[in-house]
């Protein structure tokens, strides 16, 4: 199904009604710019159906926070392998921000490894991106990152598409 098809546009509009960021993440994942995405806010069956209608596989994963409270995450991808990797590593487990976890999540979410390593050492370190460029990313770019520079045109294209839907 082509990105400019009426069905895709309609699903994106409906996802956008829920949350712009959800629609944007979904299309970045559908178009292969992100191998896997995670939605940390509640998502009902209708939202899951919309993700599936645009060609994404979905899975809801239960995790815990430090207080022991259960939280539900929705993960989605075009590849069952990424969903299985995430589920095996994180289902039923507490959320943690260890360097090991951040590296693994960075891999799954398609973040440049150099940016992940820099973020672990120095979160939100100054980079050379204009604020409007950093805003369309889901990772914090490291200084002079060549991979981020290569990703940005695709991210901008999808961001503009979602804005126009």
Spans of features found by a protein language model:
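A conserved ligand/cofactor-binding region detector
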Residues: 1-93, 104, 111-117, 121-165
């Amino acid at each position: 199904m082509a990105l400019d098809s009426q069905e895709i546009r309609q699903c994106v509009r409906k996802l956008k009604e829920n949350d712009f960021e959800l629609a944007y993440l979904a299309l970045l994942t559908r178009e292969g710019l992100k191998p896997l995405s995670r939605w940390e806010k509640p998502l009902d069956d209708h939202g899951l159906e919309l993700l599936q209608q645009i060609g994404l596989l979905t899975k809801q994963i239960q995790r815990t926070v430090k207080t022991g409270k259960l939280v539900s995450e929705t993960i989605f991808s075009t590849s069952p392998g990424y969903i299985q990797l995430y589920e095996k590593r994180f289902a039923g487990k507490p959320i943690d921000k260890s360097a090991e976890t951040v590296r693994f999540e960075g891999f799954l979410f398609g973040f440049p490894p150099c940016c992940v390593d820099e973020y672990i050492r120095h979160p939100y370190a100054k980079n050379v991106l204009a604020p409007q460029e950093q805003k369309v990313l889901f990772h914090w770019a490291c200084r002079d990152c060549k991979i981020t520079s290569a990703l940005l045109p695709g991210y901008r294209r999808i961001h503009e598409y979602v804005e126009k839907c």
